[in-house]
């Protein structure tokens, strides 16, 4: 939702849902870990009340442990943290799950799958970033397609891909094994309902081709 019009956030969510969106994703940034400042638990709680879709949160903050409970109490469905930044990662992941949310770990473009191997049994999903952290609208990093394949080789967890997802890049990631895609700028550059439909159909076409359908 980083690329949405925040003055009409509930309506923007509704439009994406009409286009087939199955969850809502937003990035929480603190202007410390990354040079951008976004939203907090109060906005998350409002968003949860405005939609029946699951709300997925990526904590791009310097102290994610301090925000786990506030976002869980806001009603989000899943919380993603970054292994290289999160102190006491096992404890944080355990708290996320104890509070009733799914827990995910992020692989940035510079992070290899082997760096999270030890925590995989305690996760519900893995997120592969196909752009750098901090800003929406960045260009897709093509090398991340191979990283998605590598993650699929080392674990059976669902892989979510975030960054640079369009009708052109969605098929690449689906064919590589991604189970969920986060699209932002490509959705809100035009009519969110129609743009979402285009991206989803592109991904589904890739699935049909892979299955010989």
Stretches found by the model and what they are:
Residues 1-80, 84-88, 95, 101-103, ...:
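Conserved N-terminal beta1-alpha1 strand-loop-helix module at the mouth
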Residues 97-100, 105-108, 179, 184:
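Amphipathic, soluble alpha/beta structural segments
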């Amino acid at each position: 939702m980083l690329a949405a019009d925040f003055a009409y956030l509930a309506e923007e969510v509704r439009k994406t849902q009409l286009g087939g969106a199955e969850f809502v994703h937003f990035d929480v940034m603190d202007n410390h870990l990354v040079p951008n400042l976004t939203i907090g638990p109060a906005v998350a709680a409002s968003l949860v009340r405005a939609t029946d879709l699951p709300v997925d949160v990526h904590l791009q903050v310097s102290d994610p442990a301090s925000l786990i409970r506030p976002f869980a109490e806001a009603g989000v469905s899943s919380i993603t943290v970054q292994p290289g930044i999160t102190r006491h990662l096992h404890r944080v992941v355990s708290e996320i799950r104890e509070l009733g949310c799914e827990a995910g770990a992020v692989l940035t473009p510079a992070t290899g799958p082997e760096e999270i191997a030890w925590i995989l049994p305690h996760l519900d999903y893995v997120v592969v970033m196909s752009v750098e952290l901090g800003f929406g609208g960045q260009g897709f990093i093509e090398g991340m397609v191979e990283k998605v394949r590598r993650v699929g080789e080392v674990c059976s967890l669902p892989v979510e891909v975030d960054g640079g997802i369009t009708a052109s890049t969605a098929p690449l990631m689906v064919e590589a094994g991604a189970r969920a895609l986060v699209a932002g700028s490509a959705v809100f550059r035009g009519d969110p309902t129609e743009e979402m439909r285009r991206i989803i159909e592109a991904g589904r076409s890739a699935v049909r081709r892979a299955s010989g359908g």
